[in-house]
Amino acid sequence: MSRIYFILCLLGLVCVACQPATNTSTGKNTAGFNIEIQNDSTTITIYSPWQKGEVMQQLLFSQPYERIVCTSATHLGFISELGMTDKVVGVCRPERVYNLSEEDRDRITDIGDDMQPNMEKILMLNPDLVILYTYAQGDPIPAQVEALGIPILYCNEWTETTPLARAEWIRVFGAVFGCQTKADSVFASVCDAYGRMRVMGDGQLAMGKSIMSGMSWRGTWYVPAGGTFMGNLFRDAGAQYKYEDNPSTASIPLTMEQAIQDFAQADIWVGCEANSLKELEAIDQKHTWFKAYQAEQVYNFRRRALPSGANDFWESATVHPERVLQDLQKVLKGDTTGLYYMLPLR
């Protein structure tokens, strides 16, 4: 019996040893994706941002991708952080991309507008992957790309409502390029820095500084609800915000009169689209009625912007929300030195 028992145990060990090595990684801050690595095969599962738990796509591959087409400048924020811009062969409106070297700009092909990419140009580039964002269910662009016989990958980071959830999508790009360890390291560093600053934000609440966002455009003023990306940033920065307790993940449309009622006495004004106080007044003279305007405490996110319209805020800030958080905490304390993305209007 002892010999039979020994042989059975030995066979059991062999069977266990022969099982394929599997490493499954789900998002820590997001339910938007899952990455499974089994031996030399990687599977990225993307979940629908509109139907919770519903699989939107699965991408299975055995080699890192070498020729990438991107439809959003935000994708370049992740790719640049990983040092992989040399893998990009096409992008929508490259003049609107901040994180490209002159060499990259000469080499990369413009594939047209992100809402209607040029399929002929994409086909001629012979990419092995097209990274897409989808703006709605039933978006026709993914089917058009797949009809060319080219694999696609949905990048839905823009639907995430918390800063760390958006930043975590760098792990998807790490899997695509075969540099998962580097992507995990970047994200861990971001989480650590953001967590430390969020604790500082808790302390700043006692200062009682209030914040407002956006501006009036054609009669409507959109402000972030408390459950949005920016609403969460305001909370983590330690700012008092009128709609911080509104759990919606959508923007709230206000009339100018409502905005004045809600924010006339706000201390800090961020995220307006004007480049100067004079321009802000020209858009609507009532902008001058706000305390923040009168105190010259108005900021946009254009410190790292180019005349072409490229703006690093839409790229690296997605990867590094701790930099945005630090900017917000600085201006709440009246400190404008060393701001990374924010620029005071004068």
Task: Place the predicted regions along the sequence by residue.
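Bacterial Sec-dependent N-terminal signal peptides
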Residues: 1-26
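Bacterial Sec-exported substrate-binding components of ABC uptake systems
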Residues: 18-76, 182-212, 278-281, 294, ...
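A short, structured surface patch at a secondary-structure boundary
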Residues: 46-53, 61-124, 129-135
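Second-shell loop/turn segments in exported
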Residues: 64-67, 78, 107-113, 129-132, ...
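Structured C-terminal subdomain patch of bacterial secreted/periplasmic proteins
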Residues: 66-67, 160-185, 271-346
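Soluble non-cytosolic domains of exported or imported proteins
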Residues: 69, 113-117, 135-139, 160-167, ...
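Extracytoplasmic ligand-binding site segments that recognize negatively charged/polar headgroups
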Residues: 94-99, 138-141, 156-171, 208-232
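Flexible, glycine-rich surface segments
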Residues: 199-284
